[in-house]
């Protein structure tokens, strides 16, 4: 039985959210429907509120297995506020459930253009890639629908929003570790990981470091045993001035290969940018023990020492 709530869009949405959390998806959907009718009857333009209501009702449909109506509501939500992460993820899940893998791939890929660390999108891309390779063969990418280019404004909007999705993003590294390190990769996983890493390397050569991070992340979901993939992703983080992420990736690389010179050098660079000069010098020292004549490391040591003086 739906709770009695007054005819306020905000209260109807809040009541719907509570029902959703309680697993009462039909009741939640009805409340979102009432809120939508009320909002539309007002005639006032509030596209963000309307988009959220469509997206929330889509989540109810998805939980109940009504993928067709989920897709319709997500599409309505995205028409009001393009490049919103939640409706993109929900529509991708619905497409995947209906085995419309190419369309699911496009939505997951669009999410990763907005935020390349959303764990559910990374995991979804990994699943869908396997399905597409199996069904369409090695040239499956040529058979995909066009993937929208996400404008910078949409990326900035997402980065500034204190939404629930950011809680997911904050947990991405641990989820990535769980998804990859909890199992031994198969031979097929290793091959896919290598292919994705090479795609990342090609993107780095073209100067597209953000896209390269996506490829390296997909590669690590297939197999987390390649030290070079972590250190390559660290390079991209350095270029994008994401220094803490660079430190994390170099640390993972060194856990796998304690003599990875590039990982030591890139972590030293990141520590220098973070003004952690002591840690930077420590990494440079470790590197020079492996390669005493490494010119870039010697130069970096001079720069760090100058900054300390």
Swiss-Prot record:
Residues 158-189 are annotated as: Disordered. It comes from the Eukaryota. Disruption phenotype: Mice are viable, grow normally and both males and females are fertile. There is no effect on spermatogenesis or protein import into mitochondria. Its main location: cytoplasm. Keywords: Chaperone, Cytoplasm, Isopeptide bond, Membrane, Mitochondrion, Mitochondrion outer membrane, Phosphoprotein, Repeat, TPR repeat, Ubl conjugation. The lineage of its organism: Eukaryota, Metazoa, Chordata, Craniata, Vertebrata. The keyword Hydrolase does not apply. Interacts with HSP90A, VCP, ATP6V1D, KIAA0665, AMPK, and DMAP1 through its TPR repeat. Residues 164-178 have a biased composition (Basic and acidic residues). It is a peripheral membrane protein. TPR repeats lie at residues 9-42, 51-84, 85-118, 193-226, 227-260, 261-294. One of its GO terms (cellular component) is mitochondrial outer membrane. The modification Phosphoserine is found at residues 8, 160, 186. GO terms for molecular function: heat shock protein binding. This is Mitochondrial import receptor subunit TOM34. Belongs to the Tom34 family. Isoform 1 is ubiquitously expressed while isoform 2 is expressed only in mature testicular germ cells. Isoform 1 is expressed in all testicular cells. Isoform 2 is highly expressed in early to late pachytene cells but expression is significantly decreased in round spermatid cells. The gene is Tomm34. One of its GO terms (biological process) is protein targeting to mitochondrion. It is found in: Cytoplasm; Mitochondrion outer membrane. Plays a role in the import of cytosolically synthesized preproteins into mitochondria. Binds the mature portion of precursor proteins. Interacts with cellular components, and possesses weak ATPase activity. May be a chaperone-like protein that helps to keep newly synthesized precursors in an unfolded import compatible state. There is a cross-link at residue 197 (Glycyl lysine isopeptide (Lys-Gly) (interchain with G-Cter in SUMO2)).
